[in-house]
Amino acid sequence: MTEQRPLTIALVAGETSGDILGAGLIRALKEHVPNARFVGVAGPRMQAEGCEAWYEMEELAVMGIVEVLGRLRRLLHIRADLTKRFGELKPDVFVGIDAPDFNITLEGNLKKQGIKTIHYVSPSVWAWRQKRVFKIGRATDLVLAFLPFEKAFYDKYNVPCRFIGHTMADAMPLDPDKNAARDVLGIPHDAHCLALLPGSRGAEVEMLSADFLKTAQLLRQTYPDLEIVVPLVNAKRREQFERIKAEVAPDLSVHLLDGMGREAMVASDAALLASGTAALECMLAKCPMVVGYRMKPFTFWLAKRLVKTDYVSLPNLLAGRELVKELLQEECEPQKLAAALLPLLANGKTSHAMHDTFRELHQQIRCNADEQAAQAVLELAQ
């Protein structure tokens, strides 16, 4: 009598955020099926949970057109090899975690061979290049989406999608401890505090830092003792920000932080930030915010024609209205940014209303995403 093979799940993660999601999914699946086998492209966290890595995640973690072109032959070789090896292995389910440019084609290749496929983390198809939804529909049996409006978009096109909530919403408390965060950063409990988050990419820090610093200078006129915290994602961004500050606002005293973005948000009365995941994190930290964003004029012109949503920040997309002020392009200038931030720093009605809505939205997307994703995989594997 042949021994029944264990549940076999193939996974591909292409960057650190995907490695974190993959590790959480594997952990949740092992609770249900302790002897399951996990195999594919994995980072250190997934490997620590027991995933066999046929390739290291770093192989796929390339950014920017020039880098991708330089590595294209290798990336195509890896995808062809995975198509062949997964085809021979016949896993019960394949889970492509984010990395849509790599994974969606791979999912399509495997689906043609009768392998069930899941795409975990929806690309921003609801915002731009909406026709990608048809390719995703052909390539996958199921999309796992972090946000409810993403599921609504897929439903419109009859592409199977399951809203599982957001892992970040699971990780962050509904009621953060502001004073504890201030103690960590050395900020007095009774001070007014502003966080500046000019982005994680070099181009963003270059475009936004000067305006953000000038905004802080204006706010200091109203709040002379205003504490200003600036978390920067790495040494490179810190160096870049310090150079810009030396030119624009050499006398402005600020607390520069290495990482610690979440602590800075929790500790602050208001934040001025670039759009992106930081806006969602800031909402979950219950920190009132203003989104300021600039890009090169041609890029902005193009984006305006391609982007199909009314808002750029996730809190507004979740709320379905302008909950958070978005000041983009010409609007992203110190006078307007300062005017939008002043009522938030006052800690009055505006801030409290925003805080309450942030809490409601947090509850909506706090669904134990790892467990929800595991349930979806197990149901498809049957």
Swiss-Prot record:
Keywords: Glycosyltransferase, Lipid A biosynthesis, Lipid biosynthesis, Lipid metabolism, Transferase. GO terms for molecular function: identical protein binding; lipid-A-disaccharide synthase activity; phospholipid binding. Its EC number is 2.4.1.182. Belongs to the LpxB family. PANTHER family: LIPID-A-DISACCHARIDE SYNTHASE, LIPID-A-DISACCHARIDE SYNTHASE, MITOCHONDRIAL-RELATED. This is Lipid-A-disaccharide synthase. Pfam families: LpxB. Pathway: Glycolipid biosynthesis; lipid IV(A) biosynthesis; lipid IV(A) from (3R)-3-hydroxytetradecanoyl-[acyl-carrier-protein] and UDP-N-acetyl-alpha-D-glucosamine: step 5/6. It comes from Escherichia coli (strain K12). One of its GO terms (biological process) is lipid A biosynthetic process. Condensation of UDP-2,3-diacylglucosamine and 2,3-diacylglucosamine-1-phosphate to form lipid A disaccharide, a precursor of lipid A, a phosphorylated glycolipid that anchors the lipopolysaccharide to the outer membrane of the cell. CDD domains: Glycosyltransferase_GTB-type. One of its GO terms (cellular component) is extrinsic component of plasma membrane. It catalyses: 2-N,3-O-bis[(3R)-3-hydroxytetradecanoyl]-alpha-D-glucosaminyl 1-phosphate + UDP-2-N,3-O-bis[(3R)-3-hydroxytetradecanoyl]-alpha-D-glucosamine = lipid A disaccharide (E. coli) + UDP + H(+); a lipid X + a UDP-2-N,3-O-bis[(3R)-3-hydroxyacyl]-alpha-D-glucosamine = a lipid A disaccharide + UDP + H(+). Coiled coil: none annotated. SUPFAM superfamilies: UDP-Glycosyltransferase/glycogen phosphorylase. InterPro entries: Glyco_trans_19.
